[in-house]
């Protein structure tokens, strides 16, 4: 992660967490997936009102031992897992959440996922995509089921919204552009967990059946933005997709830009 990316995430997080805390005086606890060296976690822990911290990172996951070592040096009190998020045993995180809830009834838990973006990004050009990498978002359902977060925050390249099927050569099928993205968003909103052992087609069929029969209630509200780092004071133009899923008692808020390209807009 570059300094610019870390700064960008920090600005967004500081604004968002302050708004959440002011609304209900809640304390926010983060589980940081794909945590890297800790840019997002730093943004979380710099959020404060006055001199009081309002958010804390309690668990971090990354497969790279060097990234985890750096993260641990800066955030020594969090649980650290040098593991593949697809196979991580979630029991230690779930047990920690239970302890925090017992001590702090105002605790709210946030699942942050900066999903691997290489196989969505347009920077990859016409090269084949890795289908396993593109399905990492599906592995979040296990975390949603066991952790039951109050808020889920996703960060990725803007092409994440184009997530669709691949052909036999691993190339995106243009007519299916965005199909899997939209279906994934719906599943998260309705808390629909893919049934283990079923093929994708069966998942789709079951989900549609449950929706038509009004057998599913919406668990999360959803909103997203494409935000540009340059609009928040960074020295480069870098667009990113940010998505938020919030339970009914949690607000979804977004920061207002602090800078503009033409220099003529006013902040007041």
What are these regions (language model features)?
Residues 27, 56-57, 106-108, 149:
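Local beta-strand N-terminus motif with an aromatic residue
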Residues 110-112, 153:
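N-terminal Rossmann-like NAD(P) cofactor-binding module of classical short-chain dehydrogenase/reductase
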Residues 96-105, 117-268:
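Class I S-adenosyl-L-methionine
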